[in-house]
């Protein structure tokens, strides 16, 4: 047979994208986000979007250690403070206004959590990097004032990560789930009975039904409703008031949306992703009291900048602990 007569594999539209959308996700309702705010013309590893009670935005830059403050509505960006700990990955706000900063440390055993006042002063350890071996990435508060955090350690064949609960008095740490390949994002359902966890290096979404104590898994209550596809994997997540879950896909320049049972119902794309831009989408968050979702991403690989993008979501965001 002449070589010109052989069957030919050819790219379909979109399949030569740097980050092609898997076939099983191509029929999902899809929107492309709009630019909302440029944080830097440099590629910074933005993370940890969180709003204070005044409606202003805080976020962190992991590798440089800067905690940014964005005054709204004028969107003025300032440096609030520099983390004295290595690789801060998330900022959460207590209802009394204190800032809780999770840091990854050396990515092996020196992560922890410290708290500061609203101006970034008076640092105090909550989870010390001296007496523990966590690599702490994301937290979420419950209504009692305790919080869950993800342990970002391990990789696909070394299951060292997990999720832990810190009591409201910050005196005890209880394991909830363990043996994960880089636990990353964590979110609570509106009734606080379901815990969502993303497992980056295994490309899995965990749905955990909790008993009243908040740490015991209900009988048959731990499941994996979704397996993600592609490199790298699921990152931080948040919920809306309809209990939909929004999961940033790191390395893919998009956010996937799931209903409260874990079925995919939509997706949000970063502009330029097919050409390899803004693939480091890390964290979604809602502007308080609205259905406007913002997502941070950066373009380090292409010597590009660091941006926050925005869309209208399915429902208004859920009011988290700092607004209680």
UniProtKB/Swiss-Prot annotation:
Molecular-function GO term, any one: hydrolase activity
Residues bound to Ca(2+) 1: 47, 137, 184, 235-236
Residues annotated as the enzyme's active site: 235
Gene3D superfamilies assigned to the protein according to its UniProt record, in alphabetical order: TolB, C-terminal domain
Amino acids binding Ca(2+) 2: 109, 111, 129, 132, 134
Free-text cofactor note: Binds 2 Ca(2+) ions per subunit.
InterPro entries, sorted: 6-blade_b-propeller_TolB-like, SGL, SMP-30/CGR1_Lactonase
Principal location class: cytoplasm
Keyword Hydrolase: yes
Glycosyltransferase found in the keyword field: no
GO CC, any one term: cytoplasm
Role played: Exhibits lactonase activity. Acts in cells with perturbed membrane integrity and is possibly related to the membrane homeostasis.
Family statement: Belongs to the SMP-30/CGR1 family.
Name assigned to this protein: Lactonase drp35
Organism in which the protein naturally occurs: Staphylococcus saprophyticus subsp. saprophyticus (strain ATCC 15305 / DSM 20229 / NCIMB 8711 / NCTC 7292 / S-41)
Designated gene of the protein: drp35
